[in-house]
Amino acid sequence: MPFVQIHLRSGRSEVWLQKLSRTIHQSMIEEINVPEDDYFQVIRQYEKSEFFYDPFYLQVERTDELIYIHFTLKQSRTTEQKKALYRSIASRIHSELGVRKEDVFIMLAGNQDEDWSFGNGRAQMIE
């Protein structure tokens, strides 16, 4: 059950944002076996004065088109699955939305089953 937070500069259309969201989700389905209906994402847009990055950290040249994609998900994926996910997302966003691969910044934060409540104040994954 991944929860995805997407952060980017403001100015994109609703249609573009929906395509970005679905593009990321499709990579999750294919690379880390996320069910199609396991779809929980938020997109936050920021003004220039609220969005910061180093344009050359680790010799990757970034622009104002930078997209931060932050996953919170169970610690059940292998290193190879994670690497495949990174490649798939960057490639898809580039080919479908025209964003440079260098501007796709992905972070994964793992947790356990007991760290999720899907509503009703219950921990459904451990009940």
From Swiss-Prot:
Transmembrane segments: none annotated. Belongs to the 4-oxalocrotonate tautomerase family. It comes from Bacillus subtilis (strain 168). The gene is yusQ. This is Probable tautomerase YusQ. The active site is at residue 2. The keyword Isomerase applies. It holds the Pfam family Tautomerase_2. InterPro entries: Tauto_MSAD, Tautomerase/MIF_sf. GO terms for molecular function: isomerase activity. Its EC number is 5.3.2.-. Gene3D superfamilies: Macrophage Migration Inhibitory Factor (3.30.429.10). Coiled coil: none annotated. Keywords: Isomerase.
